[in-house]
Amino acid sequence: FLALEADLTANMGADLSAGGPNASTNAASTAMGGVYNIPHVFMTSKGVFTNTTPVDAYRGAGKPEANFIIERLIDIAAAKFNFDPVELRLKNIISTLPHNTAFGLQIDCGKFKENIERACNYIDYEGFLKRRETSRTKGSLRGIGFGCFLETSRGFPVEGAEIRFSESGRIELRVGTESNGQGHETTYIDLVSKSLGLEADLFDYIQADTFKVRLGSGHGGARSMHMGAATMMIAVEEVINKAMG
């Protein structure tokens, strides 16, 4: 691929929300082009008012739309020029890391090519044409679709986490993100307990307690696992280093 030009018209609804404009501009730009090496990307976005419910950030907020654009374009190009859609993706996938996108973001890790190849092996992609022809003789249509998703976290780039051991044998996991139904208390404890080789029921989960949690930037922007879990793993490394040292 040489370049991508995206001209977006985003439905803001009948009123302007706090996150609606950001979802179709800044958030979308972080994923525009997906996991493909596209040296030049130009994007414009125009918000329009309609007689519908106001749009605001929910899950992903702009990244699904950006990924859909490039993935759909690849399928259209493959059909028009008689390319295999998987081969076209593999030919243009990001292969050298770290990779700087056209918008200046750095992608430092990712197994993009390997993920596509594993998916192909898992579904027996080579045998798809035969399965499709068999279905056709029975009066059925069989289709197949591929899509890669590049996710970027938003929100403040600062996070905190602490692991504290008490004389009683209990362990406090203090986190700066906050769960309001997503199940952080289960996911985080599972991650930390397995990393330390300890039983999960030894942990007490602490959030939203300003007497105990010294630093945190909350949830939102798909940042809790990106930022919160990464910070916890740094704390895990500190615990192990102290225990070994």
Language model features with spans:
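Helix N-cap / loop-to-helix initiation motif
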Residues: 81-89, 197-201
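Catalytic cofactor-binding cores of redox enzymes
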Residues: 85-87, 112, 240
